[in-house]
UniProtKB/Swiss-Prot annotation:
Function text: Encapsidates the genome, protecting it from nucleases. The encapsidated genomic RNA is termed the nucleocapsid (NC). Serves as template for viral transcription and replication. The increased presence of protein N in host cell does not seem to trigger the switch from transcription to replication as observed in other negative strain RNA viruses.
Assigned EC number: 3.1.13.-
Binding residues for Zn(2+): 391, 498, 501, 522
Encoding gene (name): N
Protein name (database record): Nucleoprotein
Source species taxonomy: Viruses, Riboviria, Orthornavirae, Negarnaviricota, Polyploviricotina
Any GO BP: symbiont-mediated suppression of host cytoplasmic pattern recognition receptor signaling pathway via inhibition of IKBKE activity
Site positions (Important for exonuclease activity): 458
Length: 562
């Protein structure tokens, strides 16, 4: 997706709105830490680190000095991240959401590793290049035969660490507002109040646009304290002791009250999963993405990395130099369900059989599926979301065979909304649907079987959630009007095949579209009518049910009053 432009500021605004409930007023905390640093930090050592970071090449001694200074900073601050690895499982996040998160973290991992690649042998760490350095370096590498013409590498400024353990560099970069403010005050010879005023104005500007070097120069005429900020383009891996524009903007964001700034988000173990879920929803709405091309992170990538690095604290502004690992190391995604508890022994020996379906029911399902022809056109449709389906149908028009079943929903509120605007199924009619039938059907489907569907996304998710990535889906992609050409005829001819769609369905009209039908959506009827569109006619003969009705529902529990 490297060719896609990123509307960075719009993304930031959307993230601010969507995550505003987790933003916190941090000005007082930041200034308390700033005062602690002004009192306890040895700024001669800070100056030494700053000089070291301006050199083109650094060694193990330089890294030791950097890490020692960051440890001192961490010990003086109260706003610091603590190591807290997070484990995400199916439950509060759906399997689909976990798969999306896992994919994004893997892409982010590839981007970061390509941006901070190891070159020239073990222990030589390189940051990124400016365009000028890139051009000159490419010419030299081509001259000596190391790089082929046309091989493009881009990034920030050349930074080489000639060290034995590159892993020690992890989490030693990035700015902290308390450090930025204290350095501006102490090293710039300014009062703390003047620095706060100048950075507050910079933060206010940030609520309307991304401040650039021109904006910085203009604000410096009003606030002389801002003149100590480096007049250079942002770099990827620079010390938090460097007074860069991005560091100043971050500090300013913390000083703006009521701005719901992303920089002020606070994460706790109890809120982590909800924040991640909300982030994925915002991502989908704004069509955000992870771009694996080396370079600066876009707003979504930046927030995702910071959230997943440490599960507690302020991911943007806290001291995190003592955190070990990267985002993809510290947020673990587990797709497997929790192991079943061992069976409880029964009195006369042995243990109860803990299965969802009785063996005879599962065997009947297996025989029904074996009656399908693997090579015939096979339609499939579901009602309800893929993570909570309430109806599923499989239909083969050549033989007129079909499998049709129901499932009681977990989310009753969402089910009632879907009933009103879509399928018209009443909860009381499927309350005693035998659990586990849909899963058993999917489990026993022949390997690599091909299905036809009108809209494949939900079916794909349903199959993937059951570990059936081998099943194939052909999406016919009819328009809404095309798909329902035979709707009235199908219901008139075959409504006796399904009596579970008794509810009233309300027309739902989206802006710019024709109002939907008020006929209920039945998975079986939909399969028959969609097939009819392709064949040009609806069959006269009655389709044949493969799954007996008596196994679709269980007997309701009875209460005996003594």
């Amino acid at each position: 997706m490297s060719d896609q432009s990123v509307p960075s500021f719009r993304w930031v605004q959307s993230l601010k709105r969507g995550l505003s409930v987790w933003t916190t007023p941090v000005k007082a905390d930041v200034l308390n830490d700033t005062r602690a640093l002004l009192s306890g930090l040895d700024f001669s050592k800070v100056a030494s680190v700053q000089r070291m970071m301006r050199r083109e090449r650094r060694d193990d001694n330089d890294l030791t000095n950097l890490r020692d200074n960051l440890k001192e900073v961490d010990s003086l601050m109260t706003m610091r991240s603590s190591q807290k690895n997070m484990f995400l499982k199916v439950g509060s996040l759906s399997k689909d959401e976990l798969m999306e998160l896992s994919s994004d973290l893997n892409k982010l991992k590839e981007k970061v590793q390509r941006s901070e690649r190891i070159i020239g042998g073990s222990g030589v760490y390189q940051g990124n290049f400016t365009t000028t350095h890139l051009t000159r370096r490419s010419e030299i590498l081509q001259l000596v035969g190391i790089q082929r013409p046309g091989l493009n590498r881009r990034g920030g400024v050349v930074k080489i660490w000639d060290i034995k353990e590159p892993a020690l560099l992890i989490n030693q970069f990035g700015s902290t507002p308390a450090v930025t403010i204290s350095c501006m005050a102490e090293q710039g010879g300014e009062t703390l109040n003047d620095v706060v005023q100048g950075l507050t104005d910079l933060g206010l500007l940030y609520t309307a646009k991304f401040p650039n070097l021109g904006d910085l120069e203009a604000l410096s005429n009003k606030h002389s304290c801002l003149k100590v900020i480096t007049q250079e383009e942002s770099q990827i891996n620079i010390s938090g002791f460097n007074l860069s524009l991005s560091a100043a903007v971050k500090a300013g964001a913390c000083l703006v009250d009521g701005g719901n700034m992303l920089e002020t988000i606070k994460v706790e173990e109890s809120t982590f999963t909800t924040i991640i879920k909300t982030l994925l929803e915002i991502k989908s709405k704004e069509r955000m993405f992870v771009d694996i091309t080396p370079g600066q992170r876009n707003p979504y990538e930046n927030l995702l990395y910071k959230l997943c690095l440490s599960g507690e604290g302020w991911p943007y502004i806290a001291s995190r130099s003592q955190i070990k690992g990267r985002a993809w190391d510290n947020t673990v995604i587990e797709f497997d369900v929790s192991p079943r508890k061992p069976p409880v022994p029964i009195r006369n020996g042995g243990s109860p059989v803990l299965t969802t379906l009785k063996p005879e029911v599962e065997e009947q399902i297996k025989r029904s599926i074996e009656s399908l022809s693997v090579h015939d056109t096979t339609w499939i449709d579901i009602e309800g979301p893929p993570f909570d389906p309430v109806e599923m149908a499989i239909y083969q028009p050549d033989s007129l065979k079909y499998i049709h079943c129901y499932r009681k929903p977990n989310d009753v509120k969402s089910f009632k909304d879907q009933s009103k605007y879509c399928h018209g199924i009443l909860l009381k009619d499927i309350e005693f649907a035998r659990p586990g039938i849909i899963s058993a059907i999917i489990k026993h489907l022949p390997k690599s079987m091909v299905f036809t569907a009108q809209g494949s996304e939900d079916i794909r998710r349903l199959f993937d959630m059951h570990g059936r990535q081998d099943l194939k889906i052909v999406d016919v992609k009819f328009t809404a009007e095309q798909s329902r050409v035979f709707e009235e005829l199908t219901w008139k001819r075959f409504e006796h095949l399904c009596d579970k769609h008794k509810g009233i369905v309300i027309k739902s009209k989206k802006k710019g579209t024709t109002p939907a039908s008020t006929n209920a959506h039945c998975a079986l009827m939909d399969c028959i009518m969609f097939s009819g569109v392709l064949l040009g006619a609806i069959p006269n003969d009655k389709p044949r049910r493969l799954l007996p009705l008596d196994i679709l529902f269980r007997e309701p529990d009875t209460t005996v009053v003594l």
